[in-house]
Amino acid sequence: MVTIFSYIALLLSALVITLTCYIGLLKIKLI
């Protein structure tokens, strides 16, 4: 159970990081 939870947490963190980077790139392109 702990390993599955940590795996999901890792996936979520990676998703959030990619989303923030993507939004940052979009803002830079818009400006």
From Swiss-Prot:
Which family does the similarity line name?
Answer: Belongs to the PetL family.
Task: List the membrane topology term(s).
Answer: Single-pass membrane protein
GO annotation terms (biological process): photosynthesis
Q: How does it assemble?
A: The 4 large subunits of the cytochrome b6-f complex are cytochrome b6, subunit IV (17 kDa polypeptide, PetD), cytochrome f and the Rieske protein, while the 4 small subunits are PetG, PetL, PetM and PetN. The complex functions as a dimer.
Answer whether the UniProt record assigns the keyword Thylakoid to this protein: yes
Domain of life of the organism in this record?
A: Eukaryota
Q: Which residue stretches, if any, does this entry annotate as coiled coil?
A: none
Keywords associated with the record:
Chloroplast, Electron transport, Membrane, Photosynthesis, Plastid, Thylakoid, Transmembrane, Transmembrane helix, Transport
Q: What is its main location?
A: plastid
Please give the name of this protein.
Answer: Cytochrome b6-f complex subunit 6
Instruction: State the compartments where it is located.
Output: Plastid, Chloroplast thylakoid membrane
Span-the-membrane segments of this chain are 4-24
Family annotation (InterPro entries): Cyt_b6/f_cplx_su6 (IPR007802)
Q: Which Pfam families match?
A: PetL
User: What is the stated purpose of this protein?
Assistant: Component of the cytochrome b6-f complex, which mediates electron transfer between photosystem II (PSII) and photosystem I (PSI), cyclic electron flow around PSI, and state transitions. PetL is important for photoautotrophic growth as well as for electron transfer efficiency and stability of the cytochrome b6-f complex.
Gene Ontology CC: one annotated term? chloroplast thylakoid membrane
Specify whether Transit peptide is a keyword of the entry: no
